[in-house]
């Protein structure tokens, strides 16, 4: 895994105004017309492409943006299926790059304040599988990446189990 910086350079009213702000890989602009519509960013791999991410659920499947004192996160991951084929997550102002060029693991990323969230996540796990996003929606001020991180750590501790194949990314408690 390779870590790069994610920086929101501006908020603009139209997509056409975003490009001048995208100077370095990881630079981003939020297109905001009565709420966030698009995230436009310079591809973090350095290929020079501008990646557009839909943030408006009214326009179809959309990513969610989380802004907090810890930084900005975008959920779920971004996976370009053309050109450079980059796969990355945006978590707390960092871009974590995945794939053969970068490695795969981010589970070792630790957070000093994770203990309380880990307990809250464990309390919300049950016999039925839930996604990190579903669990995060039940925990005020949490983000799906933090919850997913906790779920994976709970699996390593033998307190939770992750589904397989189509249920990958869904977790349940081990009794």
Task: State what each model feature region is.
Residues 84-117, 121-127:
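Short flanking/linker segments adjacent to small metal-binding domains or redox-active Cys/His motifs
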Residues 155-166:
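A short, conserved structural fragment
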Residues 1-50, 58:
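N-terminal cysteine/histidine-rich coordination modules
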Residues 164-175:
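Short, cationic-aromatic polyanion-contact patches
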Residues 32, 38-40, 47-81:
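Compact nucleic-acid interaction/catalytic patches
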Residues 21-25, 30-35, 72-92:
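Short helix-coil boundary/hinge micro-motifs
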């Amino acid at each position: 895994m390779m870590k790069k910086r994610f920086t929101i350079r501006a908020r603009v009213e139209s997509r056409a105004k975003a490009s001048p702000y995208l100077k370095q890989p990881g630079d981003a602009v939020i297109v905001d017309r009565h709420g966030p519509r698009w995230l436009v960013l310079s591809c973090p791999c350095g290929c020079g492409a501008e990646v557009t991410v839909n943030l408006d659920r009214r326009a179809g499947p959309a990513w969610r943006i989380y802004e907090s004192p810890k930084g900005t996160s975008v959920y779920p991951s971004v996976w370009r299926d053309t050109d450079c084929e980059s796969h990355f997550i945006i978590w707390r102002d960092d871009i974590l790059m995945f794939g053969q060029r970068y490695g795969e693991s981010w589970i070792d990323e630790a957070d000093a304040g994770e203990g309380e969230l880990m307990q809250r996540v464990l309390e919300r796990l049950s016999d039925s599988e839930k996604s990190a996003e579903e669990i995060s929606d039940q925990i005020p001020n949490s983000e799906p990446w933090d919850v997913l991180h906790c779920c994976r750590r709970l699996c390593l501790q033998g307190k939770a189990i992750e589904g397989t194949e189509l249920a990958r990314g869904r977790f349940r408690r081990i009794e």
